Amino acid sequence: MIDANVLVEALPYVKEYTNQIVVVKYGGNAMIDEQLKAAVIKDVTLLNLLGVHVVLVHGGGPEINEMLEKTNKESKFLNGLRITDDETMDIVQMVLCGKVNKNLVNLLDKGIGLSGVDGSLFEASCLDSDLVNVGKIEKVNPQIILDTFEKGYIPVVSSVAKAIDKQGTYNINADLAASELAIALHAKKLILLTDVKGLMKDPKDESTLMERVKVSQIPLLKKEKIITGGMIPKIECCVKACREGVESVNIQDGRVMHSLLVELLSNQGVGTLIE
């Protein structure tokens, strides 16, 4: 029997998010595990039916690594970012814009696949010459996303960008792409799905989850080495989004079934809220 209390609890949140924009960075185990993937797709489909404008921004690190292995090419990283020479860039585009993007679109009844190149959605310059074809987003042109909303579609965006300082394209960190898009769209919420519970005082102890973190606390948390490694760029993306008008930013565990619905349509919340 359906628990009516659950539906009643969700009602004010449905009202709050109807006709609002939510940007979700989709990656990690939530993209690989078939059960988790199905749950995310169901969550996004339901949110769309409720009138929430959801954008999925995805990377595809594991799939890129797999394709590089097949071509006998080594995956190299610098400060957590993939060194993307011309050959690797071709593979990145093929995997992200082709395989990963189209597979996700195929699972969504109202999905429409886009890359950051389409409509010059993301315009970028070189981030670091040592990384070769890794870009820094200089401008976001969100009109193509707004057009898809008007027609009731769910945009699924791969994280590559049009180069403005050369001919060609750039590989973009998906967290950064999601953050910049959320800012440009004046999104109500940005959610980064990860493979950890959120920001924890002790990464090995999930009971130390920090459910709410103020932007003003971030420098001290870095100094105390609570924010380290791969969490640093995620937090920096969140801080920028908060400072530039995104109402709510969340880092949450993509391994939790239906975590998007729990976060958006209940009073429980998931992960770490940056405010």
Where are these regions (language model features)?
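Nucleotide/pyrophosphate-binding catalytic subdomain
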Residues: M1-R255, Q268
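Short, basic/aromatic-enriched C-terminal tail that caps enzymatic domains
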Residues: S259-E275
